[in-house]
Amino acid sequence: MVAAVVQRGDGRFLLASRPEGSHLAGLWEFPGGAIEPGETPDEALRREMMEELGVEVQVEVPVTFAFHRDEERDVLLLFYRARITAGVPTPLLGQQLGWFAPRELGTLATPPADAELIALLAGGTA
């Protein structure tokens, strides 16, 4: 799995809520998704951002990774800094979008796999 850490000039981060009816519905997360067979993480993240938000991104540097095991599966999540190069983020899959200041990140209900990154960003160290 891959996820984009997109930050605006005012310091706010882009997060999306998981749509109703999905696994972990309603939780806020960094946008992204699964790596398809034959894709690189970079290709997968660019595809997911277009499919989910209608934006083109430039994938920049890796930020961190997270491993989480739940009752359904093991998840290895790769987080990359990304910059929107075309389009305006639009919720194309029934999710909500929000731009959150670092201090607000810790107040959001998020999946366990995002917890360490949120702690880093909220502390200003990532």
What do these predicted ranges mean?
Residues 33, 47-48, 60, 95, ...:
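Structural detector for helix-capping/boundary residues
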Residues 39, 46, 50, 54-60, ...:
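HhH-family (HhH-GPD) DNA N-glycosylase catalytic core used in base-excision repair
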Residues 35-36, 68, 104-106:
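Short histidine/acidic/glycine/proline-rich micro-motifs that form metal-
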Residues 8, 56-57, 65-89, 98:
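Active-site-adjacent beta-strand/loop module that shapes the phosphate/pyrophosphate-binding cleft
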Residues 12-51:
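Conserved Nudix-box catalytic region and its N-terminal flanking loop in Nudix hydrolases
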Residues 1-13, 65:
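Conserved N-terminal beta-strand and adjoining loop/helix that marks the start
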Residues 81-83, 90-124:
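NUDIX/MutT-family hydrolases
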